[in-house]
């Protein structure tokens, strides 16, 4: 009988980690707000590291401010830095939303961030006037870097945004809230595409599609200050409390749906990322349940195209091939189910996160695929390297961080997730939805053919 075999970590040291710290997830979330600006309350490196990572992956600049704490802040605190930082941002950039993202240093110091924000609001009102100051919303996001990971930081940020900005009204707005998780601009656009085909108006918490894949064209908006096009408008964030329901497409982003449900009696569904046929079917059914809108022929046609593509290649090139998957826990579970749908064997799944959601989800995949799956939960790429040397596979699926391991082991690597920095265009190419599944079918098959398609067989295929 198929089962999930969880392999426990045998060392305390982390070698080549798969996850990073909480603030990255919070900065990503705030960057998806129209005229939104993250302000990192920490040292310069806390923002520089993330900006560098975003620039490598998205090939776009990221506007992230920092209070630039130094050694003296460890003794005297960062009050002056945060208050002046908020004031400077408000005066120079005039953002709609400023997200104050805490870090290791500010959390360990014990800075009264909430108190500093109140003082900063008073100072901003003195300089800019009450009316202008009231238009700028400040969201406090606690993300201590010494615990958890970027996915927890993202979850904390989305909850803080909702709790701070949502304003209940007497009537529903007829909109559906979607929390996409940490995904690429191409995935966000695919989510909006599916909602559009069903005639559903959605509120993305948050929409990073244009901010991280912005068109290079003259802006019609005020050029001083200049903001990237797109993002979730402040009005939509305030209107969240009046929506039909909330669907989170990442199991780690469950705090905001729970908060909205508790405060406003709003139905919610926390699920896996809609990767592959089964997961996308589930997403479409949930949207239909929440809105009452029918599934259109256009969506059924897109689904049919993927099924046809799978039938073309699965039995011929993919069936029975063993796969190692690593990275974002929500994406890895979705990818494990999808490769099983292709007739492949998800031999091992490795992620830097461990919680009951992912364990239970992967158990379901093992049962559905009738295959034993080895799971490296809460581990790193070193653990995966050791495993693969003893248990070889035919394909690796994950981020660019595993490229050297794949090269050393002679295993082809199909790149998904974050970060991908040694190839271009992956941030624009969806893996979510039926169109994303089609990209995966083609990409996985071509990666297999590049490695295992023998030259002596070429004439037979002509």
Swiss-Prot record:
EC annotation from Swiss-Prot or TrEMBL: 1.18.6.1
Cofactor detail note: Binds 1 [8Fe-7S] cluster per heterodimer.
Annotated signal peptide: none
Root EC class: oxidoreductase
PROSITE patterns, alphabetized: NITROGENASE_1_1, NITROGENASE_1_2
Obligatory cofactor(s): [8Fe-7S] cluster
Alphabetized InterPro entries for the sequence: ChlB/BchB/BchZ (IPR050152), Nase/OxRdtase_comp1 (IPR000510), Nase_comp1_CS (IPR000318)
Chain positions recorded as [8Fe-7S] cluster binding sites: 21, 46, 104, 145
Catalyzed reactions: N2 + 8 reduced [2Fe-2S]-[ferredoxin] + 16 ATP + 16 H2O = H2 + 8 oxidized [2Fe-2S]-[ferredoxin] + 2 NH4(+) + 16 ADP + 16 phosphate + 6 H(+)
A GO term for molecular function: nitrogenase activity
Keyword Nucleotide-binding on entry: yes
Alphabetically ordered keywords of this record: ATP-binding, Iron, Iron-sulfur, Metal-binding, Nitrogen fixation, Nucleotide-binding, Oxidoreductase
Any GO BP annotation: nitrogen fixation
Gene3D superfamilies associated with the record: Nitrogenase molybdenum iron protein domain, Nitrogenase Molybdenum-iron Protein, subunit B, domain 4
Oligomer and partners: Tetramer of two alpha and two beta chains. Forms complex with the iron protein (nitrogenase component 2).
Function: This molybdenum-iron protein is part of the nitrogenase complex that catalyzes the key enzymatic reactions in nitrogen fixation.
Annotated PANTHER family: LIGHT-INDEPENDENT PROTOCHLOROPHYLLIDE REDUCTASE SUBUNIT B
The family this protein is said to belong to: Belongs to the NifD/NifK/NifE/NifN family.
Name of the protein this chain belongs to: Nitrogenase molybdenum-iron protein beta chain
Species name: Methanococcus maripaludis
């Amino acid at each position: 009988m198929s089962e999930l075999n969880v392999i426990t970590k045998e060392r305390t040291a982390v070698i080549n980690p798969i996850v990073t710290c909480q603030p990255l997830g919070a900065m990503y979330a705030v960057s998806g707000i129209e005229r939104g600006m993250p302000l990192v309350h920490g040292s310069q490196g806390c923002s520089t590291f993330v900006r560098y990572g975003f620039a490598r992956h998205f090939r776009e600049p990221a506007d992230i401010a920092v209070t630039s704490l130094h050694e003296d802040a460890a003794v005297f605190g960062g009050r002056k830095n945060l208050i002046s930082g908020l004031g400077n941002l408000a005066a120079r950039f005039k953002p709609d939303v400023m997200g104050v993202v805490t870090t290791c240093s500010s959390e360990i110091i014990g800075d009264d961030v909430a108190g500093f924000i109140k003082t900063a609001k008073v100072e901003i009102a003195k300089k800019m006037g009450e009316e202008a100051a009231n238009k700028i919303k400040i969201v406090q996001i606690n993300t201590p870097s010494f615990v958890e990971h970027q996915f927890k930081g993202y979850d904390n940020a989305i909850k803080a945004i909702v709790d701070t900005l949502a304003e209940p009204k007497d009537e529903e707005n007829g909109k559906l809230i979607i929390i996409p998780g940490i995904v690429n601009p191409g995935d966000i656009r695919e989510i909006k595409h599916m909602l559009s085909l069903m005639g559903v108006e959605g509120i993305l918490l948050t929409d990073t599609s244009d901010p991280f894949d912005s068109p290079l064209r003259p802006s019609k908006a005020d050029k001083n200050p200049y903001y990237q096009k797109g993002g979730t408008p402040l009005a939509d964030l305030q209107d969240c409390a009046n929506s039909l329901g909330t669907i989170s497409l990442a199991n780690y982003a469950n705090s905001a749906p729970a908060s909205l449900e508790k405060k406003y009696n709003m139905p919610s569904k926390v699920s896996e990322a809609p990767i592959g046929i089964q997961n996308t079917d589930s997403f479409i059914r949930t949207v239909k349940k929440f809105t009452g809108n029918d599934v259109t022929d256009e969506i059924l046609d897109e689904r049919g195209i993927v099924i046809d593509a799978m039938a073309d290649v699965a039995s011929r090139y993919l069936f029975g091939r063993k796969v190692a998957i690593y990275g974002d826990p929500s994406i890895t579970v979705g990818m494990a189910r999808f490769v099983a749908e292709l007739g492949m064997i998800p031999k091992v799944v490795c992620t830097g996160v461990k919680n009951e959601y992912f364990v239970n989800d992967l158990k379901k995949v093992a049962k559905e695929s009738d295959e034993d799956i080895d799971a490296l939960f809460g581990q790193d790429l070193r653990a995966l390297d050791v495993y693969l040397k003893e248990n070889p596979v035919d394909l690796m699926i994950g981020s660019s961080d595993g490229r050297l391991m794949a090269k050393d082991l002679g295993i082809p690597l199909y790149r998904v997730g974050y970060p991908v920095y040694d190839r271009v265009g992956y941030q624009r190419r969806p893996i979510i939805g039926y169109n994303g599944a089609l990209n995966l079918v083609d990409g996985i098959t071509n990666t297999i053919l590049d490695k295992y398609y023998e030259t002596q067989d070429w004439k037979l295929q002509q």
